UniProtKB/Swiss-Prot annotation:
Keyword Ligase: no
Keywords from the UniProt entry: Ribonucleoprotein, Ribosomal protein, RNA-binding, rRNA-binding
Family to which this protein belongs: Belongs to the bacterial ribosomal protein bS20 family.
A GO CC term attached to the entry: small ribosomal subunit
Pfam families, per the entry: Ribosomal_S20p
GO biological process: translation
Identification of the protein by name: Small ribosomal subunit protein bS20
Sequence segments annotated as region (Disordered): 1-25
Other facts noted in the record for this chain: Was identified as a high-confidence drug target.
Amino acid sequence: MANIKSQQKRNRTNERARLRNKAVKSSLRTAVRAFREAAHAGDKAKAAELLASTNRKLDKAASKGVIHKNQAANKKSALAQALNKL
């Protein structure tokens, strides 16, 4: 446990951020998994719809600093390629 008051506050802030980041990353994984399942099933219409929502989530996570912007771009590119293969 920290003795310095500012570090105690940082610890509380970091814990809140960690929990928020964990929730965002979990929803990202769920969205990507749903898209991949639709793409694997060959449902192009549903996959296209899920791709749009997944891209929004990736962009939002990147803008909030949860993931790096290049990681978001790489995931979006890979998912778009998977959709185009259908």
